[in-house]
Structures are given as C-alpha cells and as structure tokens.
C-alpha cells in the first residue's frame, strides 16, 4: 500500500504557497481544517496508482517575499548568533536565511583497503537540499540574507560552465523571488553557441537564470571582479538593484557558512552520533571559502584542516584564505591552521580515466557517488569529499599506510552530483555491462492477463 499527502493547486504559485494559504490563521484546528473550503489536505491511497486531488487556492497576487510564517523555520530570515568561540570575529553577520536542511547526517563510510584501525566517517552535506546544492547552501544562507537586507532585486555571480555554485545561487535566488544573472566561463570555440542542457546548466535554465558566456581567455584577461562589475553597472543603468556574489560564494561573509558547520559537527559529536571524536579536518579546495570557514572554526575548536586544492596552487590558496581571515579580523596565519596540498590533476573539472574509474569504484563499493570536479584526498579528520580529493587520499593511504593507522577521519561530502552528467562520454566505457533479458516467447503470465504490473 502506498500513501501520500497531496497538496496541489490548479494555479501557478510563488514560493511558500502553503504558508500563504494558512497565513490568515496559523492556529487552524483539525475541525476548521476539514471544513474550510480553501484549505484542504487529502490523503490519497492506492495499490498501484497515486491519484492527485486538487486544492483550491486563493486568488494569486504578486508580492515580494514574506517570511512571516514558515514550517520548521525553512525559508525564514532569522537573527544569527555565532558560536561563543567565534564571537570575537568581526564583522559578524546579523541574519541567516534558512535555505538548507541541517544538520546533515554523519555515518561510517566503509571505504575499501583502509590501513589498519583506520575509521572513515562521512558528513553528508550533499543532502543539504536546494536541488542537490551541497556545501554551497551554507555560504548562500548568509549571502542571501545580506542581499535581502540590502534590498536587492537580482543576484549576479560567476563561475565555470558546470559551476555547482552558480547553479545553487540560481536556485536560491528563485526561492526568494529574485532574478539571477550568471557569467559562465567556457572555451572560446563554444562561447558563441547555445551552452546546452547538460548537468548544472539544465537546472539553471529551468529556474530562469540569465546566462552570459565568456571565454576562458576573456576570463583570464579581465578577471571575475571586473566581469561582475561590468554586468552590475549595466543592470544598475536599467534600474535594477543587483547584489554580487563572488566566485564560489567565497568572501568573508560566505566563510561563516562553514564556521557554523564546525559548530554543527561539535554538537553532533556531543550527541554521540559518530561514536568517537576525530583527529583532523581534510577538505577539497575549489574557491577557498569552505576551507577558510573550516580553518578558522576548527582552529578555534582545536582541530586542524588539511586541504587539497583542485585548481590554482597551494601558495595561491594560502594567500586567498589569508585575505578572507583578515577580513574577519581573525588574527591568525592561514599556514598555521590549514595544510594545503596540490590535488588538481589535469585541472579544475578535468579528469583522467583513472580518477573517473575511482569514482565508479567508490560508488559500486559504498553506494556514495562523488563529484568528479574535486579529487578525493584524505589526511586526518574532516575531508570535504569530491572525486578528486578522495582519490588523492586513498593514494596517499596506499603509499604511506603507517601515517593513517589508527586515525579517525571525517569526510564532508560537498555534493556536486550533477557534474557527473558532463562526463558521460568518459564514463561510458567504465560502467557495468548491460544486456537484453533472454525471455522465451512461450512463457505464460502467472497472474492473468491485461495487468500493467
């Protein structure tokens, strides 16, 4: 038997339709609930087919986002109180917009061929919600709260053609009834062509993001700051109020997303969800914001971060993270709190056959699908996982097994599943075989004829 509660409307709706429908009476009791004509919930039960019963909606009127009523705090703009150990940082964000589903779970990850007495745990930030937006949600909760506070009516951000951050930003903007403008970097031979609907592009275009393409050469020559400034100036001249989010959402405000995540991990450890403490934090580094937040948070919490960069080089990230930490008046040297190693392989979002084969093997062995953009690397406690990072870690475990013996490691799975859809041609030779099932024509049906199932 299958059961579902169906809420639907014959009209188009904007974010939080349930809240809008119930706003007039948040204490609606069960009797009123059954008799009020415009507010009905139907339980539909069927053995094989689920029927959908329509709920009549109130007349639709366009209004700006209103968060005066919400369920479980989702899509609400709340005052933010930092952890006590981070209260000296400055500036401290005043508000946080609840966009994700937190805390994300932690569970054991049974990776094959681990060194003796090595435990690996996985924190599932890939389950943070917002259309598989992974770790990007944490940064956007603070950035979007700031955009709303500044009265923005649209968002600008920039990244690669398969940027997880850009896709997450496009979704978050629509949650809040804001337009989104994306500047996406691609090859010079494709910059004048339709970018298609593969992976993140499909979601971005479904939610109505405005896409401007630039070549990698233009991006390198002009830079992300100037490109976003040019688009911002254009929109301001059109009477818009744009809010610019940098590459990866990585600035001193976005860093708070993973300062908050460290507090979340602390609380999960205190509740006994992991059965033990961890030794260090290991992350894959793409734009710097995540490792900066984890770095300052873990340093204040007495942990150390080991980061594996998937683009640029370690020195670049040390300097970039230092700028972010200085922006928070953290009073700490980036090289004292994080250990950055190179794991970019062919480069950001580029993979060798060996790396993709590894992603497939991990999925087959554990059921966990990794992002191919970031390499799987492991060192000590918390690893932000993606394909490239874990690959590097497992390789280091084979080459230096004594380094890992007895270690307790936490991987943070940062999401990015949609990036795999841009790798289908490379993945095709690596996935399992298929065949047509051999069925003899004379085999009779055992449960009669004319049934669908």
Label each region the model flagged.
Residues 2-33, 38-453:
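PLP-dependent amino-acid enzyme catalytic core
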